[in-house]
């Protein structure tokens, strides 16, 4: 990870990065993100870039170096562009619809499944078989999308279920009768 850690993070116009000890705050047109990093890793703002430095070449410092740089890069990208994850529902009668802020999924259970998005996460339903999760925090967008997918995981025999857009579902042969 040390090669990634050595790359500086470019700060686009309209985005400000503030470092206060181990706390890094990133403000942009879409919102504000704050995160506390390991105090051993040094984060500096120089000109229009964020530079991450490690104290030594120990294995744990090398790993934290790259991780910290990637997390800061995702924070900068999130407040400037935002993140989006798309899911598709595959199966006869599988539908998604929005009811206020809640997402209501009809995916073959005896009852509709309701999902309430957490603060800062927006769920859109462009069609009744597509769901889009949007937000500025990459980690939370992925977690909400994963929770929606876990309601009905894609099964290998008919491919029914909720899957990420473009996800390949490995199919299996059914049993052959005698």
Curated annotation (Swiss-Prot):
Subunit and partners: Part of the 50S ribosomal subunit.
Keywords: Ribonucleoprotein, Ribosomal protein, RNA-binding, rRNA-binding
Taxonomic superkingdom: Bacteria
Gene Ontology MF: a single term: structural constituent of ribosome
Protein name: Large ribosomal subunit protein uL6
Role this protein plays: This protein binds to the 23S rRNA, and is important in its secondary structure. It is located near the subunit interface in the base of the L7/L12 stalk, and near the tRNA binding site of the peptidyltransferase center.
Assigned GO CC terms: cytosolic large ribosomal subunit
Signal peptide start-end: none
Pfam families: Ribosomal_L6
Lineage of origin: Bacteria, Bacillati, Bacillota, Bacilli, Bacillales
GO process annotations (BP): cytoplasmic translation
Family statement drawn from the similarity comment of this UniProt entry: Belongs to the universal ribosomal protein uL6 family.
